């Protein structure tokens, strides 16, 4: 490839890093060019190459390491073939791990030389893997961690539809808002196969080389089959690759000289020499890859991709399993013969990373980047091991113990089951308590990791739910298995065996004190079995261990918050499955903030009282001069105001005792009194949750002040954000019911979530002991009992009897489950776990598809896509078959026959199975669900917060610089594909939209869509919001038809995850209607306003202000659609509502009144001049009416307040209409008006941060 191509591609890839590095690497004053280059600015260097194109230019930063430059070279299209090389400057080799600033004399326009290195066996294997990926010869990988289509994005196929719609009518022209959901919406589209460059590249049957040839530098033997049908045997040698004389029957790895000797340092170059068609095919492959957005194919590095719950069935063309001999060889190619290359000492890596310096910004960036990558690698490795443990593939260290008590070590990770195998939690609820405890432990460790306390260490921890089992994977803490001397405790701080023995150690006090202060934990006394007092900084359950490496480890962090005392003391609370019901950290934080604001208020009041008292006592006369007096007054005023602003909060302290009500017995009166005070504080916190937090959330949702949850996941996130535990679903459902029809949507969602979670607990109990080959049968049968009882009231589990004989000890009790018993058990579980009573016929009103989706996500199921039948009328019609001849349908024409019986001629002899909703074959796969303890980047968050504050203070330039720096930090630390980065893209796109930089907003919103799809799921609530925002920004940029395609896709997703009539869909329908008006599609626009009105009336009632606002818009839409009579009627309705709700003096009432008068006059004149109107209608073609009625609105995120979504400025200025009435009336009457808005000069969109990973920047 030409040099220019290489340069161009690279310059495309790096503008983001250019902008960013300048910001990250010091906000230096603008000094001389040279000094800036040396201080971390960007500069260009050239790289001299041994082959074509012989030289390339690369943009670098002095803060980059040499290995980053290497990576840039490896990824450029002109230099793909190099993997084994080093760089030289001035004839000296440069170390890969030094920063460029440390390379002597290196400056702008310097030339470094790429020198090819001899291969080692590992380098040769890596080179082979890379070239296979590069030329598209690698087949599909079967992965036990990532399921089918993991990391799928539909953005490109939706965008392709948008591009097509630009040429024809808009995408909502025939859209049916009330139609049932189509599952095709969330499936990958069929794509044309990629150009094939070679038939295969694999290891040869002669591999590995024998000893005597290894001595001569032979590393591997490969076999390459070209598109021309020839097969070549290739030797991988230390010097490169060459074609050898081997055949399938004869071994001779010496170079082949006939017709000529073919060798090259890179396998890519060698293939291009032996296959004439390779170069053309390879260029075509690159071209077709470049048509996709780079982000959609970018490999995951710091996150586990999302595995969709619905995938194409095995029979479809999308996931065809193809022959690939190298698939089974890949683990050898990647990790060597003995797999030792991938073994890592996880614990040592975690702790040494924690000990890295964090003084400078560069130190922190390097440390957090390493931390993020390490956690991602560990989470993936631990999850893979957990899957093997669950499947019984790993031998236990203690095989004689009971199954639940067995422990395992695999890949240097220690595994145990999240069950009470040794009776630790016997008094707390056994297995149920243990299961909850390990989940809470991960949350506790995550919180401590986030605090990043110097000198306090946590083990790497992951919890994996798979096939009904919960497995904990931890890095091995040095000394945890060490047998201590007699009299020594296994634990150095906290409760040793339960709470009977308590250990204390002076070394732990200072670090535990820092942790407890940050987590609002109170230092308190506990007593051992001998009633001896010990003062602990944390809960007695939280343990400190002094590792043999000298580090202080904190373990068992499941009790960093107090028990929810009120929950445990409710009537019938002893039936609750466990006693591990603790408060959430978010609630403790909210309670602390609430108490603090009370303290500040009281302090201000106290000061005012003191001041007022002092002023009363002042003598009336004053001896000072007037001048002095006035000076003092002004001084006093400023002091007074600053006094009110600044309240010293060091006097405020609030910390909760986590061991309250958990069996501690204080001894002295003083201790009892202290304990009673601690208990009161905890009770107040519990009361705060019940009397303030929960009612406030319900009220906010009732008033439409926050974004409405769409499914179980977004509901859970919303509750957790507010500090509400999932166990309060029942209480919330009661509160929601009391609010009446307005919150029906919330009540339905809460009840659906309780049913889904109850089913999950039941299914997990059965799956835990079912042999792996029968899991699909078990789940399918349970789902049929829950969702398919209408199709088949008595479903039978489908089990292969011959296979069953191999598992005499397997638990097959799931066969006995019937729809009736399952319903009874779900009712019992809901009553037990959520203290809510389901109505007697609850199963009759299930939303089948939505419930199926929620259950699939909770159990990690991947279902094959088809039109599932949950009711009898959804079943496909039966075609009577008699002896293979279709007698019944003879009069229905040939086409029908073809579709019906002729497809399967063997039907006559096959015994027909009873219809069921779900068969075992529908469950294509089960993926593990991973809970990790990865901390977020504090540095990136600090930069974002600083940028936000600067923008709020109107320091636009500084604010944008800080925000771009935060973006750079997010991408450097997390990599591009990460939920945190998706969130940031979303927030930044909003900020750019609000500052009127539309191009940048669209670019970032597009990235937000792709990264959200790939990390959170193609049909997650966040994905819907990302698409809706993208549609808004596209419309603002003038691409309204494209915007409507995105709205259509979002509406289709909404139907799948929630169903019709979601409260937030009112805003979306309004936005669609406004966009259609912009396209002058007045009839369609009117339909969407009417749909929006019907949802609004059903939710808020006919007399609400929301309804009046939509009536106001609908009246305008009717006027634009030439229905003046209808317009008058709707405007009158709007006016009457505003009048009764807001009074005659309100601005909205007055505006509606004015409109009503004008529309009424207009209607009269229209009736008089019917003929004129006919003529004027013909002139509509020349019209240029104003764009919007109410204008499009930003969609609030789930749990986000409306002003937050639209930006405070916009929220304040929102009024019914910004247009002059005359303009619209002129248009209705047929006058030729031109938009005043079009006359305004549009603000030039500010510079677009072209970020890495955009389509434009694809390499």
From Swiss-Prot:
Polar residues composition-biased segments: 1-27
Basic and acidic residues bias spans: 612-628, 634-647
GO biological process, one term: intracellular distribution of mitochondria
Keywords: Cytoplasm, Repeat, TPR repeat
Domain of life of the source: Eukaryota
First-listed, main subcellular location of the protein, grouped into a coarse class: cytoplasm
MF (Gene Ontology): mRNA binding
Pfam (any one): CLU_N
GO cellular component, one term: cytoplasm
CDD domains tied to this protein: CLU-central
Start-end of each TPR repeat: 982-1015, 1024-1057, 1066-1099
Residue ranges of domain Clu in the record: 324-568
Subcellular location: Cytoplasm
InterPro entries registered for this protein in UniProt: CLU-central, CLU_dom, CLU_N, CLU_prot, GSKIP_dom_sf, TPR-like_helical_dom_sf, TPR_rpt
Disordered as annotated region, ranges: 1-38, 612-647, 881-908, 1192-1215, 1229-1259
Protein family (similarity comment): Belongs to the CLU family.
UniProt xrefs under HAMAP family: CLU
Role description: mRNA-binding protein involved in proper cytoplasmic distribution of mitochondria.
Quaternary structure note: May associate with the eukaryotic translation initiation factor 3 (eIF-3) complex.
Protein name: Clustered mitochondria protein homolog
Native species: Aspergillus clavatus (strain ATCC 1007 / CBS 513.65 / DSM 816 / NCTC 3887 / NRRL 1 / QM 1276 / 107)
Gene: clu1
